[in-house]
C-alpha cells in the first residue's frame, strides 16, 4: 500500500552549495565596500580650488596696490612684492597639486595652467618695470611740483602744485590724460620759462630737467598700469576653476554611477543570497512535509484496521487529513463517472455535509473532460457545500478519477481566506485522497465478502428449514383440509344461534390461520407453485387497497402515491399482495395510537452496486415500492434478524416469526431486493427494489378468479371523458358490468343533458374535463347525483365505512373489478 500510494521520492536540487553561498556573501561585501569607499582625492581637488581662489584674490590685490602706487597714494612697494611672491608660490603649489591629481591628464586644465603661468610672468615683468619707472616718475613729479611752487605767478594752489600756474594746469591735465598735444604745449611753456628773465634760475632748471622726464615716463607708466590692470590672470584662474569643477562634476557623476552599480550589485547579491537561503529553507520544510505525509498514510491505514464501520473509519481518516492540511472542515464524496450521481458522502464531522449538486456536476464534468484527470478549484464554501456549521471563507475543491467508474471529490474548508496552495500541496492532497479511496474500496470489498458469507449462511439455514418444512407441509395440508371440510359441513348443519356454531367458527378461523402459516412455510421452501405474469404494481396496489384497509385497524391511515412512469414487473400479484399485507400488518402492530402508513411506487436507478444486510444489489433500473410508517421503529440489535425464519419479538402475543421471512422469500422470487432503514421512535421504511419488465401488463383480475366483479341491473351510468378511445373503452367496461353507459365529451354536454330532464344513477367524470372554475368536490352538487372522479396518479383515501358517502376518486388506470366495486358502492349509497 505505502509503496503504491506514497509520494515519489525526488532529488531536490537546491541550486547552490554552501561554499557558493559563502563566496556570494564575500562578493557582496566587497561590492558594498567599493560602493561606500571614496574614489576621488577630494582634498586635492579642494586644495586646487583654494589655490585658484587665492590667485584670484592676490591678483585683485596686486592691481589695487599698483593703482595706489601709480596715483602716489602709496609709496611702499613691499605689498606689491609680497603679492607677486604669493602669486608665484600659489602657482608652484598649483602645479604640484595638478601633478598629484588626474585632472591635468584628462582635461584642458594643463593648457589653462600654462596660460596662467604665462599671464603671471607677464604681470610680474610689468610690475617690476612699473616699480622702477614709477619711482623715478614720482620723484620727478615731486621735484617739478616744488620747483613750480617756488616760482611767483598766478598759479593757484593744488594738492600737487602749491602755486598753480598755467604750466601747472597743463601738467595736471597731462597727468589725467596724457596726450602729445599737451606734451608739446608743456614743452613750449618750459622753453618759454627758460627764456623768461627775472625768474629764479634754480627752479627753472629743475622744471626744465624734470619736465621732459615726466613727459616721457608718464605714458610708459600709464601703459604698464593698464597692462597690469588688464591682466587675464584672474580670468584664466576662473576658467581653470570652472574647468576643474566641471571635471570634478563629471568624475562625481561617473563615480556616483559606479557606486550605484556596485551598490545595486551588492544588494542584488544579498537578495539572491536571501532567495537561496529561503529556497533551502523551503526545500527543507518540504522534505519535513513529505516525512509528515508518510506518517499521514500510516495513520490513515491504522483507521481502517479492526472491525470499525467504513463510515467511522473514513470519518477518522478525514479528520487526520483535515489536521494535516490545517483545515476547519474536510469532506469526501464519491460520484458515479457516467451518471454524475453521488454514491457515498463522508465528512470529518457529524452530521454529514450536504453538497451543492450544480457545483458537483460542474467539477465532475471538468474532471471527465480534463486529460490530466485532476481538477483543482478554490471557491466560496457556501457555493460548494451546506455545512452543519456556517464556515465562512473559502474551500479547496479537488476532484480526480478514483476508479474507472467513480470520481473522488475532496473538499477542505477554511474559516479565513488563504492563498492558493502550491502544486506540491495539491499533489499531497490528491495522493491522500487516493489513499483514502483505496482503503474505502478495500473495506467495501471486505464488507461485500462478509455480506456474501452471511447471505450464504442465511440461505443454508433457509434451505434446511425449507427442506424440513416442505417434507411435512403437504401431509399437514391434507390433514388440515379434512378438518376444515368437516368443520364447514358441521357449520352448515348447526343453527347460527347455537353455542356449537360458535365453537365451529373458532375451528374454521384457526384452520384458516394454519393454512396461512403453511403457505408461508411453502414459500420458504420454494415448493409452492408460482404463476408468473407481467402486471402493473400501481394497478395491483390500487386493486388491493380496500383489502389492505380491511386488514388494518381503523386508527391507521393509508396513503398512496404513484409515479407516472410505467411500473410493470413479472411475477405473481398474489405474492406481492402477501408482501404488502405482511409489512402493513407488522407496521400497524408497532403503533399504539393513530398512525400513518405511506405506500409509494416510483422508478429508481442505482448507479453503482449497493450493499444490503442480506445481499448486494447490482446497479440498474428498478421499480421501487416503499412502505414507511411512523411507528416505534426497530431496535438496531433486532434489525439484522428480522428476515430469519421463526424469529419474532411478539412470540408471547402469537407471533410466528414467518411473516417477514416469507416477505424475503417472495421478494427473492421476484429477483428483487429489500432494504430496511429504521429509527427507534420515528418509524421504519421498507424499500423493495423489483426488476422492471417491458412486457404488456395483464389485468390483475385474471389472478383473482374467485373474487368476481359485482354486476349491475341496467342502471344508467353517465361518463364524461374527452378522449374518444378511452371513452369507448370505459363504455364497454360499464356495459359488460351490467349497466347502461351514456358517454359525453365535455362537462358542459352532460350538464345540458341533465338540464333537459334526463337522469343518471351515477356520473363518472374525468378530472381533465372539468372547467377551471369547477371544483372536483362539488361535481355531485352541480349534477345533482352521485359522482366518481377519474384521473391523476395520486390516491389519498381513508376507506373506512364512514367515508362511503363522500366523493370517490379513482386513479388511472382503472381495472374492471375496481370499477365494478366503485360503481356498486356509490349506487347503493
Swiss-Prot record:
Q: Which Pfam families match?
A: DAHL, HATPase_c, HisKA
Keyword presence, Nucleotide-binding? yes
User: Which reaction is catalysed here?
Assistant: ATP + protein L-histidine = ADP + protein N-phospho-L-histidine
Q: Which residues carry this modification: 4-aspartylphosphate?
A: 766
Instruction: Write down the membrane topology.
Output: Multi-pass membrane protein
Q: Which residues carry this modification: Phosphohistidine?
A: 474
One annotated GO molecular function: ATP binding
Subcellular location as annotated:
Cell membrane
The UniProt entry, under NCBIfam families, shows: PRK13837.1
Q: What's the protein called, per UniProt?
A: Wide host range VirA protein
Amino acid at each position: 500500500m505505502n509503496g503504491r500510494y506514497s509520494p515519489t521520492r525526488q532529488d531536490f536540487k537546491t541550486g547552490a552549495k554552501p561554499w557558493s553561498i559563502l563566496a556570494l556573501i564575500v562578493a557582496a561585501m566587497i561590492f558594498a565596500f567599493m560602493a561606500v569607499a571614496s574614489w576621488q582625492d577630494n582634498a586635492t581637488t579642494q586644495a586646487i580650488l583654494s589655490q585658484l581662489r587665492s590667485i584670484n584674490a592676490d591678483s585683485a590685490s596686486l592691481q589695487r596696490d599698483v593703482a595706489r602706487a601709480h596715483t602716489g597714494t602709496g609709496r611702499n612697494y613691499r605689498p606689491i612684492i609680497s603679492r607677486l611672491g604669493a602669486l608665484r608660490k600659489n602657482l608652484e603649489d598649483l602645479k604640484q597639486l595638478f601633478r598629484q591629481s588626474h585632472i591635468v591628464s584628462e582635461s584642458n586644465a594643463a593648457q589653462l595652467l600654462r596660460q596662467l603661468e604665462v599671464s603671471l610672468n607677464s604681470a610680474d615683468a610689468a610690475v617690476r618695470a612699473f616699480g622702477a619707472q614709477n619711482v623715478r616718475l614720482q620723484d620727478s613729479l615731486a621735484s617739478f611740483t616744488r620747483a613750480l611752487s617756488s616760482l611767483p605767478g598766478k598759479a593757484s594752489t593744488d594738492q600737487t602744485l602749491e602755486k598753480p600756474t598755467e604750466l601747472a594746469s597743463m601738467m595736471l591735465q597731462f597727468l589725467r590724460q596724457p596726450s602729445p598735444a599737451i606734451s608739446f604745449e608743456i614743452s613750449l611753456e618750459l622753453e618759454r620759462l627758460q627764456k623768461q628773465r627775472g625768474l629764479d634760475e634754480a627752479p627753472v632748471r629743475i622744471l626744465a630737467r624734470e619736465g621732459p622726464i615726466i613727459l616721457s615716463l608718464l605714458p610708459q607708466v600709464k601703459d604698464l598700469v593698464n597692462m597690469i590692470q588688464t591682466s587675464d590672470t584672474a580670468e584664466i584662474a576662473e576658467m581653470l576653476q570652472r574647468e576643474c569643477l566641471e571635471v570634478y562634476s563629471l568624475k562625481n557623476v561617473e563615480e556616483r554611477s559606479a557606486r550605484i552599480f556596485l551598490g545595486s550589485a551588492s544588494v542584488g547579491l544579498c537578495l539572491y543570497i536571501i532567495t537561496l537561503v529561503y529556497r533551502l529553507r523551503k526545500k527543507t520544510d518540504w522534505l519535513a512535509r513529505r516525512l509528515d505525509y508518510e506518517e499521514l498514510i500510516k495513520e490513515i491505514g491504522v483507521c481502517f484496521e479492526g472491525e470499525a464501520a467504513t463510515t467511522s473509519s473514513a470519518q477518522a481518516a478525514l479528520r487526520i487529513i483535515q489536521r494535516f492540511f490545517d483545515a476547519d472542515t474536510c469532506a469526501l464524496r464519491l460520484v458515479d463517472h457516467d451518471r454524475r450521481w453521488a454514491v457515498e458522502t463522508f465528512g470529518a464531522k457529524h452530521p454529514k455535509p450536504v453538497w451543492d449538486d450544480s457545483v458537483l456536476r460542474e467539477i465532475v464534468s471538468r474532471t471527465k473532460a480534463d486529460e490530466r484527470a485532476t481538477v483543482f478549484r478554490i471557491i466560496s464554501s457556501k457555493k460548494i457545500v451546506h455545512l452543519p456549521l456556517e464556515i465562512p471563507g473559502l474551500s479547496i475543491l479537488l476532484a480526480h478519477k478514483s476508479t474507472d467508474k467513480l470520481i473522488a471529490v475532496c473538499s477542505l474548508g477554511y474559516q479565513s481566506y488563504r492563498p492558493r496552495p502550491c502544486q506540491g500541496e495539491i499533489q499531497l492532497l490528491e495522493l491522500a485522497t487516493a489513499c483514502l479511496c483505496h482503503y474505502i474500496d478495500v473495506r467495501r470489498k471486505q464488507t461485500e465478502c462478509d455480506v456474501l458469507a452471511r447471505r450464504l449462511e442465511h440461505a443454508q439455514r433457509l434451505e434446511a428449514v425449507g427442506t424440513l418444512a416442505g417434507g411435512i407441509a403437504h401431509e399437514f395440508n391434507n390433514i388440515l383440509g379434512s378438518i376444515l371440510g368437516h368443520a364447514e359441513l358441521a357449520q352448515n348443519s348447526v343453527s347460527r344461534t347455537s353455542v356449537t356454531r360458535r365453537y365451529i367458527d373458532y375451528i374454521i378461523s384457526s384452520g384458516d390461520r394454519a393454512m396461512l402459516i403453511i403457505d408461508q412455510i411453502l414459500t420458504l421452501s420454494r415448493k409452492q407453485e408460482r404463476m408468473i405474469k407481467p402486471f402493473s404494481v400501481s394497478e395491483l396496489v390500487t386493486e388491493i387497497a380496500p383489502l389492505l384497509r380491511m386488514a388494518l385497524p381503523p386508527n391507521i391511515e393509508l396513503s398512496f402515491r404513484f409515479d407516472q412512469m410505467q411500473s410493470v414487473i413479472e411475477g405473481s400479484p398474489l405474492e406481492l399482495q402477501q408482501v404488502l399485507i405482511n409489512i402493513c400488518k407488522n407496521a400497524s402492530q408497532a403503533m399504539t395510537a393513530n398512525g400513518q402508513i405511506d405506500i409509494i411506487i416510483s422508478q429508481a436507478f442505482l448507479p453503482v452496486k449497493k450493499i444490503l444486510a442480506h445481499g448486494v444489489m447490482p446497479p440498474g433500473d428498478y421499480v421501487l415500492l416503499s412502505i414507511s410508517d411512523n411507528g416505534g421503529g426497530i431496535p438496531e440489535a433486532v434489525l439484522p434478524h428480522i428476515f430469519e425464519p421463526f424469529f419474532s419479538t411478539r412470540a408471547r402475543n402469537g407471533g410466528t416469526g414467518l411473516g417477514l421471512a416469507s416477505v424475503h422469500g417472495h421478494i427473492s422470487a421476484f429477483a428483487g431486493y429489500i432494504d430496511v432503514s429504521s429509527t427507534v421512535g420515528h418509524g421504519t421504511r421498507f424499500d423493495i427494489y423489483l426488476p422492471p419488465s417491458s412486457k404488456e401488463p395483464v389485468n390483475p383480475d385474471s389472478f383473482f378468479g374467485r373474487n368476481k366483479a359485482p354486476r349491475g341491473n341496467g342502471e344508467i351510468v353517465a361518463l364524461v371523458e374527452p378522449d374518444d378511445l378511452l371513452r369507448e373503452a370505459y363504455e364497454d367496461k360499464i356495459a359488460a358490468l351490467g349497466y347502461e353507459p351514456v358517454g359525453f365529451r365535455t362537462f358542459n354536454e352532460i350538464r345540458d343533458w341533465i338540464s333537459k330532464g334526463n337522469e343518471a344513477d351515477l356520473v363518472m367524470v374525468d378530472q381533465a374535463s372539468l372547467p377551471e372554475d369547477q371544483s372536483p368536490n362539488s361535481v355531485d352538487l352541480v349534477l345533482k347525483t352521485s359522482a366518481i372522479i377519474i384521473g391523476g396518479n395520486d390516491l389519498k383515501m381513508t376507506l373506512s365505512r364512514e367515508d362511503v358517502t363522500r366523493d370517490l376518486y379513482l386513479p388511472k388506470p382503472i381495472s374492471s373489478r375496481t370499477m365494478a366495486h366503485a360503481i356498486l358502492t356509490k349506487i347503493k349509497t
